[in-house]
């Protein structure tokens, strides 16, 4: 046996049916599409139309809304801030503000401010001036000898465009 002698087993493949090639072919005239109507025509069917069945986008419940007044805060863990201090990206003597976090590359595209979360360890004594901080983050910061000032006004419109 040679590579050029290899072929499929008898009956393993079937020739494709060529439709619309005369009544003697078995798939002539309407070519298996039935008679007339939208589905007999060429082209794509209507988007979202499911043959009369209630379409998915109408079956699903209408719930909730998008709150236009919601604050979009970037979340940062204290462990990430400690890494930045250890790497020399954050100055421990200066207050930790949105501008400082942006400059250190910890956050990007800040909209309404930054929220500090309490995951990780913090050993540096830092002063935070941020929009929000979780209870666990405040406890960890104060345990390390630091302080937290929370105010949504801590971020002005100039930071949002940065």
Curated annotation (Swiss-Prot):
InterPro entries registered for this protein in UniProt: Ribosomal_uL15, Ribosomal_uL15/eL18, Ribosomal_uL15/eL18_sf, Ribosomal_uL15_bac-type, Ribosomal_uL15_CS
Coiled coil: none
Region (Disordered): 1-37
Keywords for the protein's UniProt record, in alphabetical order: Ribonucleoprotein, Ribosomal protein, RNA-binding, rRNA-binding
HAMAP family: Ribosomal_uL15
Assembly information from the UniProt record: Part of the 50S ribosomal subunit.
The protein, known as: Large ribosomal subunit protein uL15
